[in-house]
């Protein structure tokens, strides 16, 4: 029988006793199994997300907002409860919110090296720039006694959220990569009864001590409760003199187009939250200067698997010298030995050692060296045997590294040096990374499978699809690197392959809405997060092949893939974070960025209808939402 259970307000999912739960945008735990439905001790709890259909022009408003019509079923034995899911925001970027320092502050606002607001001079009112692209987010609880809410019925928790870029200024000109990325700490009140999160204050993190931040994309929470950020698309120091984007970045950050140093960007920032709702930041310079999308720290608290969001990218791994300390360690890059070229393909992974370093010593090199001190690069064949041909960002180059500069090359010219050392620099837009610790599996999102993965120019040659796939890694210990030395980790990837349900499907002809990839399968996966409690992999899209980008849930036991959220048309799914237990509640955090970023022909059939709706919802397309999933209601089932 089924019995509806009504609730007068949104509630979060509450954990059963002793069962940790995934970070759902609003805790998925506020509705425990009814007492009479609880089974005997030891019975397994099962979770299944139930899919919703994609929105369509039959109801245009659903295509122009964050739309959720999915459900979650929680079962024990013969008893189950199904929860309707919804979405709630903390704010839209551009909102005025309470500041942790007193007064108010602009959410997603941009600041220069002196922490002064950066004004959009094309705006009639010279308004402060604010981002339409919130991205990586971490939910952090400091524990009882460290931070207290002023409300007796609430606990104090925090979120760290970063803002990747500004799509355009008021005049409509592109601002991509021209502003220093802000990052903020949100102080949140967590209702002890429902798990509801309410924004109490916002604090912009002072990044002047790390030379500002460059294009912060995905993020993860470390096992020691810090926020691990990113700096993707590292500026090429070899060609920096002609890089207008970087000069604009430097002008906006320093007030001088030549002040910024490219070797200060492309590293891993780490944010520590303070009990007063502020944050402090440092950069780790010893983890490779690559297109950091996000990293995943393994349960040993030393091994870090890293995505590399570029063409001719690599699979990188860092093994820290000490637990919970990323300031020193050994950097490796993967070598793919193909075992299948069918579809997304499969390969065995071995590891090339690039070097060992501390962050301080690489920072000192970054402060003093130029590209010419490290490497000479030719873009046409010099017919000189002292140069080595490599693939770099989709093109052939010939490189010669300066004598004695191996360490600088490994950690500041990482892409070129990894290719020189024989690594498989062929992956295309390897983005999100996460771990399934119980099964010793990791997952990597290959947003697009094309170019250097399919053209035969490297040691990887697979078929596709362009719509991408999520690869599963087998993790183990007892491995040796290319020098024959032991890798001191039990969490080393030794193979990669894509589960059938996690491979996109290209369409030969666009469908009636304009999709060029099957809308009922993933397309161009980006954000990944895994819930140990729910045994569910969450997948957010960054797709130029779906009219609306989706958030998916994949049950690793049933192999069922379910669409659980749709972003506004033209937006991508970002800020994904799954947390199994925050004071007895679980959360799935989810943002989106650049709503109404119309592409042709993808949006040709919907733009005229949806553009006015998106503009009305999101401040003329200048704003985007930061938020989380919620429980809307519950139905009980007894067999």
Residue ranges of predicted features:
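N-terminal secretory signal peptides
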Residues: 1-27, 34
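Conserved small-residue
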Residues: 22-25, 34, 38-639
């Amino acid at each position: 029988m089924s019995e509806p259970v009504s609730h007068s307000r949104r509630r979060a999912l509450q954990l059963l006793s002793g069962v940790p739960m995934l970070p759902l945008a609003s805790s998925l735990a506020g509705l425990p199994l009814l007492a009479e439905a609880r089974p005997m001790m030891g019975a397994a709890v099962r979770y299944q997300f139930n899919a919703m259909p994609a929105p369509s022009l039959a109801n245009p408003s659903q295509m122009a907002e964050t739309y959720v019509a999915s459900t979650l079923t929680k079962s024990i034995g013969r008893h189950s409860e199904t929860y309707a899911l919804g979405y709630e925001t903390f704010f839209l970027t551009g909102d005025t919110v309470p500041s942790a320092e007193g007064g108010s502050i602009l959410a997603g606002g941009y600041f220069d090296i002196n922490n002064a607001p950066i004004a959009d001079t094309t705006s009639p009112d010279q308004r402060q720039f604010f981002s339409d692209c919130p991205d990586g987010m971490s939910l952090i609880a400091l524990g009882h006694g460290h931070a207290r809410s002023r409300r007796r019925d609430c606990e104090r928790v925090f979120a760290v959220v970063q803002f990747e870029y500004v799509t355009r200024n008021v005049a409509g000109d592109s601002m991509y990569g021209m502003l220093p990325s802000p990052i903020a700490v949100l102080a949140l009140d967590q209702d002890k009864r429902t798990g509801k999160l309410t924004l109490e204050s916002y604090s912009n993190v002072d990044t002047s001590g790390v030379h500002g931040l460059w294009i912060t994309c995905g993020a993860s929470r470390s096992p020691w409760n810090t926020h691990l950020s990113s700096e993707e698309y590292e500026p090429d120091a070899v060609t920096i003199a002609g890089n207008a984007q970087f000069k604009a970045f430097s002008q906006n950050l320093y007030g001088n187009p030549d002040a910024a140093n490219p070797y200060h960007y492309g590293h891993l920032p780490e944010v520590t939250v303070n009990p007063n709702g502020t944050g402090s930041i440092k950069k780790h310079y010893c983890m490779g200067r690559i297109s950091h999308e996000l990293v995943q720290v393994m349960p040993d608290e030393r091994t870090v698997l890293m995505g590399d969001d570029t063409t001719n990218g690599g699979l990188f791994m860092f093994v820290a010298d000490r637990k919970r300390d990323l300031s020193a360690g050994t950097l490796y890059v993967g070598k793919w030995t193909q075992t299948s070229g069918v579809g997304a393909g499969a390969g065995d992974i071995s590891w090339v050692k690039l070097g060992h370093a501390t962050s301080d010593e690489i920072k000192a090199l970054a402060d003093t060296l130029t590209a010419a001190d490290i490497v000479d690069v030719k873009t046409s064949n010099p017919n000189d045997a002292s140069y080595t041909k490599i693939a770099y960002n989709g093109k052939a180059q010939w490189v010669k590294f300066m004598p004695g500069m191996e360490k600088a090359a490994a950690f500041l010219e990482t892409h070129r040096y990894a290719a020189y050392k024989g690594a498989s620099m062929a992956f295309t837009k390897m983005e999100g990374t996460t771990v399934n610790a119980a099964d010793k599996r990791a997952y990597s999102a290959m947003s697009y499978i094309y170019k250097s993965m399919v053209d035969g120019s490297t040691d990887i040659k697979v078929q596709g699809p362009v719509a991408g796939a999520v690869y599963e890694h087998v993790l183990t210990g007892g491995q040796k690197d290319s020098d024959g030395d032991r890798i001191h980790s039990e969490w080393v990837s030794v193979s990669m392959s894509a589960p059938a349900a996690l491979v996109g499907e290209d369409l030969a002809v666009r469908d009636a809405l304009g999709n060029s990839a099957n809308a009922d399968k993933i397309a161009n996966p980006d954000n990944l997060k895994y819930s140990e409690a729910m045994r569910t992999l969450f997948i957010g899209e960054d797709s130029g092949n779906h009219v609306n980008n989706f958030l998916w849930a994949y049950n690793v036991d049933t192999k069922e893939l379910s669409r659980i959220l749709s972003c506004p048309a033209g937006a991508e799914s970002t800020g994904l974070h799954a947390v199994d237990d925050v004071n007895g509640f679980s959360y799935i955090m989810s943002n989106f960025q650049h709503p109404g970023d119309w592409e042709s022909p993808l949006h040709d059939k919907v733009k005229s209808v949806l553009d006015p709706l998106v503009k009305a919802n999101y401040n003329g397309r200048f704003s985007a939402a930061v938020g989380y999933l919620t429980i809307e209601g519950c139905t009980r089932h007894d067999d």
